Regions:
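Outer membrane beta-barrel transmembrane domains
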Residues: 315-317, 321-355, 359, 363
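N-terminal periplasmic/intermembrane-space "pro-region" immediately following the signal or transit peptide
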Residues: 3-7, 13-71, 392
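Detector for outer-membrane/organellar transmembrane beta-barrel domains
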Residues: 51, 235-334
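Transmembrane beta-barrel architecture of outer membranes
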Residues: 90-92, 123-127, 188-190, 227-233, ...
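Outer membrane beta-barrel
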Residues: 52-219, 224-231, 235-244, 313-316, ...
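Outer-membrane beta-barrel transmembrane domain signature
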Residues: 117-119, 202, 220, 240, ...
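Outer-membrane beta-barrel "beta-signal"
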Residues: 350, 364, 378-392
Length: 392
């Protein structure tokens, strides 16, 4: 069956059902006129316009919150044949401002300021969007923000619980996409609708949906073709803090550096992906996903055009402020067992007060592709890293 036809049919059916549910939710929801609470990565500093004589400010009711965080890292590996065995790294330096205007509109602007300057490197905008949040069951977001694909992708680096995202989130949910797209941190330019439906007795919503149209070229890049990426997700929450659902992505990426004289280059590659997963986030954390991808690599015409990945993460509190995470993390670049790379990881996260996080990570890697590589190197190796996060 044609994939585009199937996606359109499913989306039409889903939207009819969601609109019916939304009408019921609107009658049950008493919070429609209140600004939606927004979970921030850091506490930051908030300013509000109060006791002003300006009629415009009284109408706008603007608030603004400033914050940010720094993540510094030291890593060491015993893998042979590498240019370096590790070292110090400034993983993230991010600054943001967010807030509300006219009560119902939430905005966010976030900069990443670490890294050497260059094309798609160094200081750059990662988030710049506004969202209309008048109703829980229907919200509209416009600008540059996270693609709605996968449970882990929307997570801040501060919440993942491990020293990096899973390979599924990195390679297929587009934190660092396998297809050759510049580093976009899982984000793109576009518009998205989303909402939460059917409130339960304890206040949690049973159904969440999200659907967006995007350029498909990643952050800070204009559209380069006549195709828009369609990305969506739908999940249910039978109990508070538990979500079970799936995601779909029908898109295309255009090679902005295409060279017709280079036989390794592809002008564009399709990005047809789907995933299923679950998450439970409370004192305990349980999170797992499977993702599958169809589409090649624009810088390597010979690269496989099918890949998949899966992971399982568990986190348990040990003592106050200390949480231990374990992760089983797999990626198959060619969707074959001979292309499997598996990371077995364990991490300790200790929070010292509200603004400091100390993290110790260990990873054992088993990379089957290294056993068949032209340049031989260790296929099994160990990596340790220490990360310190300061929030402000």
């Amino acid at each position: 069956m044609n994939f585009d036809f199937l996606m359109q049919h499913l989306l039409k059916t889903s939207m009819v059902a969601l609109l019916a549910l939304a009408s019921q939710t609107a009658m049950a929801d008493n919070e429609g006129n209140a600004p939606r609470e927004t979970e921030r990565e850091t506490q930051g500093i908030t300013f509000e316009s109060k006791n002003t004589d300006s009629k415009l400010l009284q109408t706008m009711k603007p608030t603004i919150n400033f914050g940010g965080y720094i993540i510094a890292k030291y890593s060491i590996s015993d893998r042979s044949g590498q240019a370096t065995n590790g070292g110090f790294d400034l993983r993230f330096v991010r600054l943001y401002a967010d807030g509300h205007v006219f009560n119902d509109f939430y905005y966010k602007f976030q900069l990443e300021v670490n890294g050497a300057p260059g094309v798609d490197k160094g200081p750059r905008v990662v988030d710049a969007f506004m969202e209309w949040q008048k109703f829980d069951f229907f919200r509209v977001k416009l600008g540059q923000f996270k693609r709605p694909f996968g449970f882990e992708n929307p997570y801040s680096p501060l919440k993942v619980g491990y020293g990096c995202y899973s390979q599924a989130t990195m390679k297929i949910a587009s934190i660092g996409d396998r297809n050759g797209e510049h580093k976009s941190s899982g984000r793109d330019l576009g518009v998205q609708i989303q909402g939460d439906l059917l409130p339960g007795a304890d206040g949690h919503k049973w159904i969440h949906y999200q659907l967006g149209f995007f350029n498909g070229q990643g952050i800070n890049h204009a559209d380069k073709d006549h195709h828009k990426d369609l990305i969506g997700g739908l999940w249910i929450s039978p109990i508070k803090d538990l979500a079970i659902g799936g995601f779909g992505w029908n898109g295309k990426y255009t090679n902005e550096k295409y060279d017709a004289s280079n036989p390794n280059h592809l002008k564009s590659v399709k990005r047809v992906r789907w995933g299923v997963g679950m998450k439970y986030e409370s004192d305990w954390t349980v999170r797992g996903e499977y993702m599958s991808s169809v589409g090649g690599v624009v810088t390597n015409a010979a690269a496989p055009d099918r890949s998949d990945a899966w992971y399982a993460t568990i986190g348990l509190p040990v003592i106050k402020n200390l949480k231990i995470y374990g992760r089983y993390d797999c990626y198959r670049d060619a969707k074959t067992w001979s292309s499997l790379r598996t990371d077995y990881g364990i991490s300790g996260n200790y929070h010292l007060g509200k603004n400091l996080i100390f993290q110790l990570n260990y990873t054992f890697t088993d990379d089957r592709t290294a056993r068949r590589a032209a340049t031989r190197t260790d296929s099994r190796y160990n990596t340790f890293d220490v990360q310190v996060t300061a929030k402000f």
